[in-house]
């Protein structure tokens, strides 16, 4: 029997890792699962978070699996199957991956007998949909166009008329999309799987990819990353002040995503997440050293690093 291959896509900070954690800890508990993580950069923060669930995690950090590292992606899938013999592989691409490019890579004839593409999921951040679309519409529309299921995340407190507008936007691009408008934190893993797998309408991947112009997925912004490890103790209050400084785009560039695992001055570890002027923290297990990853475009890395000194 072929290994099931699920792909969980979504822009930076949309909630991909949160969704995968829900699936592996609550939904697919009876299956042998391996997660293939394609981090944007070489500091695997999301990889460490997923490993903390007890699931096997492999990672690709050399590039994006939709383009420059597509060969590494397929080789990694083959290696995972040979090494772990899993029931299911869940792939989390980078937040700036073109989902259509990943699906095209999966159609490589040499690997057809190894796996079967099962769930193709994109996570959309409802609260920041307009913000993200303003500079990454090509990525967002590409993910919508080729997904089987769209999960609307971070939807608590959002006006129903706005969500209805998102439904219309999605259906205008992908009429057959299965849309899930549930709070990921409140829905059970089993109910989530049922909503994902039992409501898929007709899906012809080759036909969809043929209709999608490859040039349409080019993005005018060139995202870059600044990442580093540190043994310095940094309080969360200091992190909030640093990220407040990033509102000065002339000095630091446009910061669209930040995440890290750090130790505070009381020797307690915590994880922080930053997306569009909103930052939050949660406690974390002990690490050997802290790590920070900042993603954006036109980054002034020297000025950013000065804030952490």
Give the positions of each predicted feature.
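Nucleotide-state-sensitive switch-loop elements of NTP-binding domains
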Residues: 2-133
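Short, hydrophobic beta-strand segments that form beta-sheet elements in well-ordered domains
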Residues: 34-36, 259-262, 294
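Short aromatic/hydrophobic contact patches that present stacked aromatics
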Residues: 90, 151, 225-227, 293
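Residues at alpha-helix caps and immediate loop-helix transition turns in enzyme cores, especially N-
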Residues: 101-102, 135-136, 162-166
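C-terminal accessory "lid"/substrate-recognition subdomains
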Residues: 142, 146-149, 157-286, 298-302, ...
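Short, well-ordered beta-strand elements
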Residues: 290-296
């Amino acid at each position: 029997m072929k290994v099931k291959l699920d792909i969980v896509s979504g822009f930076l900070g949309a909630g991909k890792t949160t969704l995968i954690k829900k699936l592996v800890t609550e939904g697919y508990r009876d299956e042998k699962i391996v997660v293939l993580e394609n981090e944007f950069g070489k500091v695997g923060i999301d990889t460490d978070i997923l490993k903390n669930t007890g699931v096997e995690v492999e990672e690709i950090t050399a590039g994006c699996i939709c383009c420059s590292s597509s060969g590494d992606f397929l080789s990694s899938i083959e290696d995972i199957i040979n090494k772990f013999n899993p029931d299911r592989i869940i792939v989390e691409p980078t937040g700036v991956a073109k989902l259509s490019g990943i699906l095209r890579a999966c159609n490589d004839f040499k690997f057809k007998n190894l796996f079967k593409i099962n769930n193709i999921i994109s996570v959309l951040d409802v609260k920041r949909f307009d913000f993200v679309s303003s500079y990454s519409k090509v990525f967002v529309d590409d993910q919508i166009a080729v997904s089987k299921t769209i999960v609307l995340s971070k939807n608590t407190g959002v006006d129903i008329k706005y969500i209805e507008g998102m439904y219309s936007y999605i259906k205008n691009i992908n009429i057959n999309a299965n849309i899930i408008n549930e709070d990921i934190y409140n829905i059970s893993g089993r109910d989530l799987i049922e909503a994902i797998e039992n409501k898929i309408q007709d899906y012809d991947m080759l036909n969809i990819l043929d209709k999608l112009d490859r040039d349409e997925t080019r993005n005018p912004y060139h995202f870059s990353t600044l990442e580093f490890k540190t043994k310095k103790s940094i309080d969360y209050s200091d992190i909030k002040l640093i990220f407040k400084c990033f509102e000065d785009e002339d000095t630091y560039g446009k910061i669209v995503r930040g995440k890290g695992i750090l130790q505070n001055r009381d020797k307690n570890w915590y994880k922080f997440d930053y997306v569009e002027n909103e930052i939050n923290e949660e406690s974390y297990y002990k690490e050997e050293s802290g790590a920070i990853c900042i993603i954006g475009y036109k980054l002034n890395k020297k000025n950013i690093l000065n804030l952490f000194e």
